[in-house]
């Protein structure tokens, strides 16, 4: 694994790994459906299973797909859903409203997201649309957590806050607890 080059797309960022056939199989089991638009794996669980998949901005059938980083790991998606159900999105929006530095960082995260997605292809239908409500709202913690896991701490403050609130970590595998 490691960084690689894809014809026409240039070098993958250092944290992205080319998705292998085994990864696609794991992703399909994780998500319960056939995969579309898989470009790379941006983050992995401690056991090696994909945690965040990088998707192309236009999938095979021509549909625009704005979600660059898609959270796939079941324990992570459960935790994001739990945080959303607990109402943390409103709390995080208030934190952004109260903290100009966090708000600026969130706007920068939005721009980073758009830049990375645009490197995979221009899709006019979704131009300026990132994910998770960026740059002004907090709508989907799954997308924001995925961004933080893919890029590391300090890029997306809301994703970082959600990870801190969750107590969940890629460093502790819970993938096979129920097997």
Each model region followed by its residue ranges:
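Extreme N-terminal basic, low-complexity initiation segments
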Residues: 2-7
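Preference for intrinsically disordered or flexible, low-complexity segments
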Residues: 9-179
């Amino acid at each position: 694994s490691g960084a690689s080059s894809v014809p026409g797309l240039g070098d993958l960022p250092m944290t992205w790994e080319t998705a292998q056939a085994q990864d696609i199989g794991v992703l399909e089991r994780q998500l319960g459906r056939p995969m579309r638009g898989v470009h790379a794996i941006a983050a992995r669980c401690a056991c090696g299973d994909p945690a965040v998949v990088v998707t192309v901005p236009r999938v095979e059938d021509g549909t625009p797909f704005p979600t660059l980083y898609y959270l796939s790991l079941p324990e992570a998606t459960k935790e994001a859903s739990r945080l959303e159900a607990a109402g943390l999105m409103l709390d995080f929006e208030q934190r952004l409203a109260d903290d100009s530095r966090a708000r600026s960082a969130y706007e920068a995260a939005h721009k980073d997201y758009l830049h990375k997605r645009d490197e995979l292809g221009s899709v006019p239908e979704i131009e300026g649309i990132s994910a998770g409500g960026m740059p002004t709202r907090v709508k989907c913690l799954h997308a924001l957590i995925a961004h933080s896991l893919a890029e590391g701490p300090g890029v997306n403050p809301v994703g970082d806050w959600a990870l801190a609130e969750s107590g969940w970590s890629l460093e502790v595998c819970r993938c096979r607890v129920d097997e």
